[in-house]
A protein has these predicted regions:
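Short linear Ser/Thr-Pro motifs
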Residues: 78, 119-120, 133, 213, ...
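Flexible, acidic/Gly-rich N-terminal and inter-domain linker regions that tether
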Residues: 1-114
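Canonical Radical SAM [4Fe-4S] cluster-binding loop centered on the CxxxCxxC motif
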Residues: 104-156
Length: 300
């Protein structure tokens, strides 16, 4: 199912696409860049806060766009380390975004390295046995603006606790696409989101600090390797042989290890980034010595 909002969000635009619309509406092209600065550097959430824009232009923006596409329904904290957000989208769909704090010189928001785990689909179609995301099935792909809005929601919240907002940089250190959904199954949204995050006019967030976790869509891994977005790749493995992995991850029946591992290594060779192999130990299924031995062969 595809959802189309009454008005698009500005977070789905690139500088190029926004500038094109601005010029078509009869405004100077430089207004596009000014808007992006207010969005990503100043993190404003209302049109009137864009104080260097003429009222007529702000009125036009208000008629064309909305800002945020997410509304926080629940904020659950755990020992000052993990903070989970239940976010409601415009069509009342629910997704989760998680902020993980890793204390460095002490426990506390200012001294923590922060990682944001974002969702890219509502539900999931892949049915991995250890994951709750697919229990209710797949509902729809998220739009670019819905993914970016998750990150900007965290930015605005954390701005109150850090000095980074004054420096006009993101108020977190890493982004992982490990929330609800399979990132490579919403491929175009994934790539466009990464480009917005990476852009100088966007969050100016380094690709090496972005990790894409996949259940193993081998052809998409090969395609991503050619995109010019040198993100990190994590393979949700959880089984070191086809027999075991297929029990845990149905996707393995379509893309077995003989296809997945070469694709992952080709991605690594293309970008020079170390691969992450994710492996949850499940008693009496994948925790044998034989599995450990096979895993070491894959990891070499």
């Amino acid at each position: 199912m595809k959802f189309t909002p009454e008005k698009p969000s500005l977070f789905g635009e690139t500088l190029e696409s926004l500038t094109e619309r601005v010029v078509e509406a009869g405004f100077p092209s430089f207004r596009g860049k000014q808007v992006m600065e207010w969005l990503y550097k100043k993190r404003v959430d209302e049109w009137d806060a864009m104080s260097n824009l003429p009222k007529a232009f702000r009125t036009w923006l208000d008629g064309q766009y909305i800002l945020y596409l997410t509304n926080s329904l629940l904020d659950k904290r755990s020992d000052d380390v993990t903070q989970k957000f239940l976010l409601e989208l415009e069509d009342k769909s629910l997704i989760e975004t998680v902020l993980i704090r890793a204390p460095q010189t002490g426990v506390g928001q200012e001294s923590s390295r922060k990682t944001v785990c974002v969702s890219i689909q509502v539900g999931c179609a892949y049915g991995c046995k250890f994951c709750d995301s697919g229990l209710a099935g797949f509902k729809r792909n998220l739009m670019v603006a819905e993914v970016v809005s998750q990150l900007m929601h965290i930015c605005k919240m954390e701005d109150a606790h850090t000095k980074r907002a004054k420096e006009e940089i993101a108020s977190f250190d890493n982004i992982v696409f490990m929330g609800m959904g399979e990132p490579l199954a919403n491929y175009d949204t994934l790539v466009q989101t990464i480009k917005i995050l990476n852009a100088e006019w966007g969050l100016n967030f380094g690709a090496r600090r972005i990790t894409v976790s996949t259940s193993g869509l081998a052809p998409r891994i090969m395609q991503l390797a050619q995109e010019g977005v040198a993100v990190r790749l994590a393979i949700s493995l959880h089984g070191a042989t086809n027999e075991v992995r297929s029990q845990i991850m149905p996707v393995n029946k379509k893309y077995p290890l003989e296809e997945l591992i070469p694709a992952a290594k080709a991605f690594k060779d293309k970008h020079g980034r170390m691969l992450t192999l994710e492996f949850i130990m499940i008693e009496d299924i994948n925790d044998s010595l034989d599995q450990a031995k096979e895993l070491t062969k894959i990891a070499r």
